[in-house]
Amino acid sequence: PLFDKRQRCCNGRRGCSSRWCRDHSRCCGRR
């Protein structure tokens, strides 16, 4: 689900370059 998608943003550094990850994942910028 959505949580898994966010978690994947956190795990991969590449994920953080995606704008969706930066907007929705706490690990990637938005705190």
Swiss-Prot record:
GO cellular component: extracellular region
Modified residues (Pyrrolidone carboxylic acid): Q7
PTM remark: SmIIIA' is a putative isoform where the N-terminal AA is missing.
Primary location class: secreted
Pro-peptide region(s): 1-6
Presence of the UniProt keyword DNA-binding in the record: no
Tissue: Expressed by the venom duct.
Subcellular location: Secreted
Entry keyword set: Amidation, Cleavage on pair of basic residues, Disulfide bond, Ion channel impairing toxin, Neurotoxin, Pyrrolidone carboxylic acid, Secreted, Toxin, Voltage-gated sodium channel impairing toxin
GO MF, any single term: sodium channel inhibitor activity
Modification sites for Cysteine amide: C28
Family annotation (InterPro entries): Conotoxin_mu-typ (IPR008036)
Disulfide bond annotation, renumbered to this chain: C9-C21, C10-C27, C16-C28
Domain of life: Eukaryota
Remaining remarks: All peptide bonds in this toxin adopt the trans conformation.
Free-text comment about domains: The cysteine framework is III (CC-C-C-CC).
Function: Mu-conotoxins block voltage-gated sodium channels (Nav). This toxin blocks rNav1.5/SCN5A (IC(50) is 1.3 uM), rNav1.6/SCN8A (IC(50) is 160 nM), rNav1.7/SCN9A (IC(50) is 1.3 uM), rNav1.1/SCN1A (K(d) is 3.8 nM), rNav1.2/SCN2A (K(d) is 1.3 nM), rNav1.4/SCN4A (K(d) is 0.22 nM), rNav1.6/SCN8A (K(d) is 69 nM), and rNav1.7/SCN9A (K(d) is 260 nM). This toxin is very potent but weakly discriminating among sodium channels. The block of these channels is modified when beta-subunits are coexpressed with alpha subunits.
Assigned protein family: Belongs to the conotoxin M superfamily.
Name listed for the protein in its UniProt record: Mu-conotoxin SmIIIA
Organism field: Conus stercusmuscarum (Fly-specked cone)
